[in-house]
Amino acid sequence: MRDAIPLGRIAGFVVNVHWSVLVILWLFTWSLATMLPGTVGGYPAVVYWLLGAGGAVMLLASLLAHELAHAVVARRAGVSVESVTLWLFGGVTALGGEAKTPKAAFRIAFAGPATSLALSATFGALAITLAGVRTPAIVISVAWWLATVNLLLGLFNLLPGAPLDGGRLVRAYLWRRHGDSVRAGIGAARAGRVVALVLIALGLAEFVAGGLVGGVWLAFIGWFIFAAAREEETRISTQQLFAGVRVADAMTAQPHTAPGWINVEDFIQRYVLGERHSAYPVADRDGSITGLVALRQLRDVAPSRRSTTSVGDIALPLHSVPTARPQEPLTALLERMAPLGPRSRALVTEGSAVVGIVTPSDVARLIDVYRLAQPEPTFTTSPQDADRFSDAG
């Protein structure tokens, strides 16, 4: 995930935190700090806010445990784990591949909600124990709050639609029933759209009834799930469409190279005008490739600065650009490009030489070509999917 800050490793997994975690940390703190006075009165405001912050941190730790459970079970199933990231909507466990069997997929998906439900039971038992040893009521209230929120988190994630864990469970069930992981994945994604529309409707109803913050938040979550479910369906459909397709089939071969030492104004006048390319590998004076520059980056340079800014200054560093080999499956490259967003490009290399480039426009063209060649497939990308790649170019 872009803009994520690495925190280190836990249990061997790379753990990142996105800046949007600050938003949910504040929301959790505010929620608990404003709830406690109505439950246990008589404390100074600073106590409520300190306990609110402490409870929020514990809840973030619970979210991390939820994601680490996915990661641990995935590793045991032989699926590589690239990272675990906390962000606005909880967490994301980035897997380096797919489960090989429906049973393994089911276990990986269920591990997260099971952990949240177990944490709910643990915090509930802690609250009961603390009550038995005459612990201050305000501390017991925080424990009950953590038990309740973890329970809701576990149950919410079991809703039957991708990208929620419940959608992964639906996918595992359909995969086992029909023996087709693609059909199962698309079915789970479409179920996710239905779940999202229900959440949006409930959020709007709550908003109309006077629950302004809760209604907007619920509708926003529904909108996110709808968008993510559509993205999931597009990804699976594209994988099916491109089964057996190599990177060499999609790339633009022998792309023109941008000299990194010339200024942006000269580059636009001498290289870009009259060309159809949207991105260029950037080379230094000895011919080695140092990065990639796209038209969007050129546009971002103010006209007054173009004569004093070199192409190398604005190029995306090579270590941030996905790379692939010509004979590699295209689907594997698209998986690596996906986390970087719809505007991402990739360089195709043989040895130390760049032999091609893959842009969103290249992918969009290939989608159109393969749709023409397969006019009535069981599952295909929609016309909007090709437009999505094309617009990003």
From Swiss-Prot:
Membrane topology: Multi-pass membrane protein
GO CC entries: plasma membrane
Database matches in SUPFAM superfamilies: CBS-domain pair
Single GO MF descriptor: metallopeptidase activity
Record-linked CDD domains: S2P-M50_SpoIVFB_CBS
Disulfide bonds: none
Top-level taxon: Bacteria
Induction profile: A member of the dormancy regulon. Induced in response to carbon monoxide (CO). It is hoped that this regulon will give insight into the latent, or dormant phase of infection.
Catalytic residues identified in the record: 67
Disruption phenotype: Not essential. No effect on processing of anti-sigma factors RsdA, RskA, RslA or RsmA.
Cofactor or coenzyme needed: Zn(2+)
Domain (CBS) ranges: 251-308, 315-376
Protein name in the entry: Putative zinc metalloprotease Rip3
The organism of origin for this protein: Mycobacterium tuberculosis (strain ATCC 35801 / TMC 107 / Erdman)
Lineage of the organism: Bacteria, Bacillati, Actinomycetota, Actinomycetes, Mycobacteriales
GN (gene name): rip3
